């Protein structure tokens, strides 16, 4: 097995039932860490109906959201964009953004961040 000091053996199996870790964020939203290292973060997240995250940006992180279930609305300084199931949206560094679930069903999506967002989130009041 190839391993880097401090990392799990690769490859390793992860799923919603067997994530690296689970967390609650925002207004009762769920997140499951699937890949979590300084170079790359991959998360599965769930937002209940009528929830939204805070407007924010990342100094150096590029993100890609891929919608699995439901429809997301992204608000950015460039406007509003609806992204439906089986569609994705890239967010470049320093772009103010937030994701909303304005629908009547749970929103589920994969979120890839490169590098990791740890220490790189600036919340806008």
Regions found by a protein language model. Name each.
Residues 1-43, 54, 121-125:
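A short, N-terminal "cap"/entry segment at the start of jelly-roll beta-barrel domains
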Residues 39, 60, 104-105:
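Short strand-connecting beta-turns/loops that link adjacent beta-strands
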Residues 46-47, 57-73, 112:
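Short, conserved beta-strand element in jelly-roll/cupin
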Residues 52-54, 73, 89, 93-99:
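Histidine-centered metal-chelating micro-motifs
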Residues 71-73, 80, 96, 106:
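Structural motif
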Residues 78-93:
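Short acidic-glycine-tyrosine-enriched beta hairpin
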Residues 93-119:
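Ligand-binding loop in jelly-roll beta-barrel domains
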